[in-house]
Amino acid sequence: MAKNKFHDGPGPSQRQLRVGEVIRRTLSEVLARGDIHDPELNRLSITVGEVRTSPDLKIATAYVLPLGGKGQEDVLQLLARNKSELRRAIGKKTGLKFTPDLRFQIDETFDRMDDTRRLFNQDAVRRDLED
């Protein structure tokens, strides 16, 4: 099999990024519109921050966060319970030959941003940045 000449770095390829973004957008739309036939899931507001795909595009990991940050484990259970219906909706809307298997994790980006902001607001760090 020929090696991809356009991607030598350790990060994801352009195709992985593009497919991940299409899946993220589709998941967000499906969850926002309430297209899933689960009243518990439809009453929640869920943010899909990022979707990362495996190099072979067989697995997609969606990083999600419920609005307000409360009930994270419940949201993961609800999404896992409705995974097949979400996967079917993604398959219809994306037109991919194979729809990736969905996995869900809590998005911790906002927590890391708060920690970083807190660090930058410390007096010692501010002095170092100003010098």
UniProtKB/Swiss-Prot annotation:
<dbReference type="InterPro" id="IPR015946">
    <property type="entry name" value="KH_dom-like_a/b"/>
</dbReference>
<dbReference type="GO" id="GO:0005829">
    <property type="term" value="C:cytosol"/>
</dbReference>
<comment type="subunit">
    <text>Monomer. Binds 30S ribosomal subunits, but not 50S ribosomal subunits or 70S ribosomes.</text>
</comment>
<comment type="similarity">
    <text>Belongs to the RbfA family.</text>
</comment>
<dbReference type="InterPro" id="IPR020053">
    <property type="entry name" value="Ribosome-bd_factorA_CS"/>
</dbReference>
<dbReference type="InterPro" id="IPR023799">
    <property type="entry name" value="RbfA_dom_sf"/>
</dbReference>
<dbReference type="Pfam" id="PF02033">
    <property type="entry name" value="RBFA"/>
</dbReference>
<keyword id="KW-0963">Cytoplasm</keyword>
<keyword id="KW-0690">Ribosome biogenesis</keyword>
<dbReference type="GO" id="GO:0043024">
    <property type="term" value="F:ribosomal small subunit binding"/>
</dbReference>
<comment type="function">
    <text>One of several proteins that assist in the late maturation steps of the functional core of the 30S ribosomal subunit. Associates with free 30S ribosomal subunits (but not with 30S subunits that are part of 70S ribosomes or polysomes). Required for efficient processing of 16S rRNA. May interact with the 5'-terminal helix region of 16S rRNA.</text>
</comment>
<dbReference type="InterPro" id="IPR000238">
    <property type="entry name" value="RbfA"/>
</dbReference>
<protein>
    <recommendedName>
        <fullName>Ribosome-binding factor A</fullName>
    </recommendedName>
</protein>
<dbReference type="GO" id="GO:0030490">
    <property type="term" value="P:maturation of SSU-rRNA"/>
</dbReference>
